[in-house]
Amino acid sequence: MAQAWAFLLPVLVLGSYVTSLFFPSYISNPLCGGDGGRSLFLCAQAPKDQDPSPAVSTMYKTAFHFQPAKNWMNDPSGPMYFNGIYHEFYQYNLNGPIFGDIVWGHSVSTDLVNWIGLEPALVRDTPSDIDGCWTGSVTILPGGKPIIIYTGGDIDQHQAQNIAFPKNRSDPYLREWIKAPNNPVLRPDEPGMNSIEFRDPTTGWIGPDGLWRMAVGGELNGYSAALLYKSEDFLNWTKVDHPLYSHNGSNMWECPDFFAVLPGNNAGLDLSAAIPQGAKHALKMSVDSVDKYMIGVYDLQRDAFVPDNVVDDRRLWLRIDYGTFYASKSFFDSNKNRRIIWGWSRETDSPSDDLEKGWAGLHTIPRTIWLAGDGKQLLQWPVEEIESLRTNEISHQGIELNKGDLFEIKEVDAFQADVEIDFELASIDDADPFDPSWLLDPEKHCGEAGASVPGGIGPFGLVILASDNMDEHTEVYFRVYKSQEKYMVLMCSDLRRSSLRPDLEKPAYGGFFEFDLEKERKISLRTLIDRSAVESFGGGGRVCITSRVYPAVLADVGRAHIYAFNNGSATVRVPQLSAWTMRKAQVNVEKGWSAI
């Protein structure tokens, strides 16, 4: 239940806005607010009589990202592939574009691109979830039996885990779900546990003893932990006397995810099946407003996760995404033998903007996720199905970019585009020296350097959503540094000039990755532009950055531009540049239900 907990704070006046996400002070019911675990935010909902502005709603609404037709959404919850259908459940407010009154929204798809919106799968109608049906997971039990386990909050805002089953497994859409009569099946009643910091159960897996395991995000004796539980039947659970993993220096871990990966193999692994020799495990947690992870091994004898590298300073932990991305959830796709991950991307405009738009939040494009060949980090790439929306391909080869050059990528829709570009370095001798302290805050370094500050190698990359006079534009680019015997590449997504509006979050996101430039010489960049959502993948998915932008140029049809640029001293060659206009997907087309 990320529930935007890392971002939400109480507000006293509608429209007050800082770089954290604030909400208006409409209190929806007595269950909201109070002391305890909900003290960081207000449950609120929009006034019933306020209609969203059609112009604003459509200007920033995405064309091929997953989001409901209206209202608030946050965490992906329990994605799965079952009987030929992809299911995406998500945290949803039926009543408005503000966080609160959370239920499980439900949509289905056959291709991960076009989605049908259904009735909510879970609503808050029992004592154990009357405060909200928070984040959870789906596990498919032997015999093809899907089961939801999710966090619910009671009237006192204490958290516990609940179970639900499909009412009719022959229904291809699994529209109706029945809650277990013995809910909640897990309470935080062990010594040292915090009843308001106990949420977001993972997908289950089977251990060598044949028992099911599951992890739940929690706080144990003041430490953050992925708490470990065992069960014979997935209904009755016992807490293991030690966590799957814990850390004494970070906040509560939300939305933990635990899955197996094979180095250099982009095929997914099913946790409910035997894990092959040589496999690693990834433990992901949502903390510090971002999604971080560790690579290690699952020690079967100890029944514990053991990181390959223990890093005390969590600023140095690996990141799933370096931008506006949180509460991600992965699942094994048995259809194509891959692991897919989604994340929630919140709005970074103001609460009053969300009220005017009538919607807030979206999910990133589903990504295939796998372990790099060296076993050090996860790689991500948009699922291949998204390419079905490509049209009107534009291709260029052999472009040479000298210092100060701009090359316009014409004849594609600059508002809805997919751009893939390779940058080839003629020389690596001009790379500036690398300062290891930059790893502690790459965003700060992106902001200080900027795309306008020349370097030895770079900045070079893309300028997107640019107005005619460049008053508004977003830069996605690289800088190359020399670090002893290796090279470090900084990837930035700089939003500081993305909009002329002052009331927005406009940071410069950034992340570093190692690159063997002497061997590869080319650095790839793929950027998907979908109106207010921009997702960029650098170095073959080594660094991913999701950005939310709100330029006024979006209202001016046909007036935005995309450029390739170089502002570094060294010449950069572009051996291949391909760009496509992206068609609109059918996202959450209603089928017999008009509330979403």
From Swiss-Prot:
Keyword Hydrolase included in the entry's annotation: yes
Classification via InterPro entries: ConA-like_dom_sf, Fructan_Metab_Enzymes, Glyco_hydro_32, Glyco_hydro_32_C, Glyco_hydro_32_N, Glyco_hydro_beta-prop_sf
Signal peptide per UniProt: 1-20
Keyword Signal: yes
Thermal characteristics: Optimum temperature is 30-40 degrees Celsius.
Keywords: Disulfide bond, Glycoprotein, Glycosidase, Hydrolase, Signal
Cysteines paired by S-S bonds: C446-C492
Catalyzed reactions per annotation: Hydrolysis of terminal, non-reducing (2->1)-linked beta-D-fructofuranose residues in fructans
Domain of life of the native organism: Eukaryota
Reported pH dependence: Optimum pH is 4.5-5.5. Inactive above pH 7.5.
Enzyme class: hydrolase
GO molecular function ontology, one term from the record: fructan beta-(2,1)-fructosidase activity
Family: Belongs to the glycosyl hydrolase 32 family.
PANTHER family cross-referenced by the UniProt entry: BETA-FRUCTOFURANOSIDASE, INSOLUBLE ISOENZYME CWINV1-RELATED
Protein's name according to its UniProt entry: Fructan 1-exohydrolase w2
